[in-house]
Amino acid sequence: AFPARGTGKGTIRFNDTAGSMAKDSAATAAAVVRELTDKDISDYDLHINVIGGGNIDGPSAGCAITAAILSAVEKIPLRQDYAVTGEVSLSGEVKPVGGVAEKAFGARQAGLKGILLPEENRKDLDETMQGLEIIPVKTMKDVLDRMLVRD
């Protein structure tokens, strides 16, 4: 996130790996961040860059995108040892997503300590995720309380 060249002239740019649903998640994330921080997101140029070469689409990255935007705007780093998944509603609620078992398996394979996931998805994981902390969340506030690294 960079200050825009003029008040209210900010943009949100997502690299070409994102499909339309992921771009919608970014717009929702910006609205939720505005509500949580009381900062006008249109005063920032936001560049969301998904690395790794694969295309993404769907709402699953909503929590991650929201946390990343808030982190950039507030200049508060995020933990790098936990994965996060979940759709975010305009009211900041974390909604269930698909593929949670695969995402948790990937987090464990990557050596992460844990995964934050929608509370409604907790039932989708069995006890085979030994060694991975499973943290169910209901709201973006829950996500940020766990993910932001505050002094």
Positions of PLM-derived features:
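Peripheral, non-AAA+ core regions of ATP-driven protein-machinery
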Residues: 1-151
